[in-house]
Structure formats: C-alpha cells, structure tokens
C-alpha cells in the first residue's frame, strides 16, 4: 500500500499526503511546497509517507 501512495505522491504530491494524514498541517504545507516548486512537494510527500 505504501508503494501505491509513493507513486501517487510522485504524480500528485498533495494527494499522497492527503491519503496519509488528511487535511492537517502537513497537507497545507505540501500544497505550498508544490506551488513553489514541484520537486520540493514530491520530496515532502515521500518523506511524510515514509515517516508513518
């Protein structure tokens, strides 16, 4: 299941974070990082998924 979430996080980082933590602070931070740059959003999403 984590592999699927990581693949989703690579394609749509905020969706991967949302599936892991819901509408928390990490989700909104990921939205911001993705808007500022796609790569930081991916790195943050993979970190959140791997951490839990």
Swiss-Prot record:
GO cellular-component term (any): plasma membrane
Pfam families the record matches: Pmp3 (PF01679)
Swiss-Prot/TrEMBL keywords: Cell membrane, Membrane, Transmembrane, Transmembrane helix
Keyword flag Membrane: yes
Subcellular location: Cell membrane
Membrane-spanning ranges: 6-26, 29-49
Domain of life: Bacteria
Membrane topology classification: Multi-pass membrane protein
Stated family: Belongs to the UPF0057 (PMP3) family.
Protein name as it appears in the record: UPF0057 membrane protein PA0567
């Amino acid at each position: 299941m984590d592999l699927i979430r990581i693949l989703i996080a690579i394609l749509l980082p905020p969706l991967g974070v949302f599936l892991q933590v819901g509408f928390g602070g990490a989700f909104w931070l990921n939205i911001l990082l993705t808007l500022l740059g796609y790569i930081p959003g991916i790195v943050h999403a993979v970190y959140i998924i791997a951490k839990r």
